[in-house]
């Protein structure tokens, strides 16, 4: 018989769960403008953040002997240290009894120094990075009443109205959308609207009154229908950004330098250059899988 029981218990949390510090020298070729790389290897998974690791080591006069008292390394020279990772990034340890030098060495013997990069940071493409697209999963967990939902949707309705009634705004809308398709990071729309837009705008340029034709009216109606369909799927453009939270990065740098790991931020604070200091933010995990994910700071 399964019985639920309530009781008080102590839990522990890992402030550096699944993250690594990766020296900026590793961000080369196609990753020169990136700031995080999600890395994979055999039984290894970690989010590596761009860090001036070697500069920090030199500035703090950290020696190889110092590092060996605070962790484990096979490096023979301090200049070889380009990555600092965490035990829970090394999934192999779960299957062999936990963290030990013997277990780490066993893993090293069976892997190469080539890591797979499966993800990196990408900024939002909407309105030059000022807007981000929501999902129905997020909206369903906010508990909005009718009035709040109408307030949230009003900018989107106003946007659709401008697309419907302003030819120049329609041109702006599709210049932005077409640019997103060409960068290779967005799937091409199956309705072919971007390709049709290219033809439509050429005709508008050549014929002053083309926007009064049935051809333009049909195109405009298809665009408006597509925007409404996106809203029904929960794809609402909101003031926001895509960002990867770097948990306690300065504290990890302090730890490898042997310094006291005091917190750089107060409880309930995050730092993001996209927003003004003191702004109230709603953070949501992606993918958004539970109503417990939203975090207000």
What residue spans do the PLM features occupy?
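Conserved small-residue
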Residues: 1-297
């Amino acid at each position: 018989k399964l019985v639920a029981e309530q009781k008080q218990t102590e839990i522990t949390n890992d402030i550096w769960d699944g993250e690594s510090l990766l020296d900026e020298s590793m961000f080369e070729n196609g990753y020169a403008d990136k700031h995080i790389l999600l890395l994979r290897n055999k039984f290894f998974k970690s989010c590596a953040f761009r860090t001036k690791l070697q500069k920090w080591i030199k500035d703090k006069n950290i020696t190889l002997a110092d590092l060996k008292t605070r962790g484990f390394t096979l490096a023979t020279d301090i200049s070889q240290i380009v990555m600092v990772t965490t035990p829970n990034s090394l999934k192999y340890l779960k299957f062999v009894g936990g963290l030990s030098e013997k277990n780490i060495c066993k893993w090293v013997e069976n892997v190469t120094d080539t890591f797979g990069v499966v993800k990196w940071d990408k900024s939002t493409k909407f309105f030059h990075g000022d807007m981000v697209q929501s999902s129905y999963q997020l909206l369903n967990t906010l508990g909005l009443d009718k009035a709040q939902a109408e307030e949230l949707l009003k900018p989107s309705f106003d946007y659709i109205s401008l697309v419907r009634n302003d030819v120049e705004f329609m041109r702006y809308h599709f210049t932005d959308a077409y640019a997103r398709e060409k960068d290779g990071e967005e799937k091409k729309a199956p309705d072919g609207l971007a390709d049709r837009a290219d033809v439509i705008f050429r005709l508008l340029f050549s014929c002053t009154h083309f926007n009064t034709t049935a051809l333009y009216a049909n195109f405009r109606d298809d665009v408006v229908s597509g925007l409404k369909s996106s809203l029904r799927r929960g794809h609402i453009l909101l003031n926001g950004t895509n960002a990867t939270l770097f948990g306690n990065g300065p504290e990890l740098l302090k730890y490898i330098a042997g310094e006291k790991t005091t917190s750089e931020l107060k409880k309930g604070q995050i730092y993001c250059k996209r927003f003004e200091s003191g702004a109230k933010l709603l953070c949501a995990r992606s993918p958004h899988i539970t109503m417990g994910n939203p975090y207000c700071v």
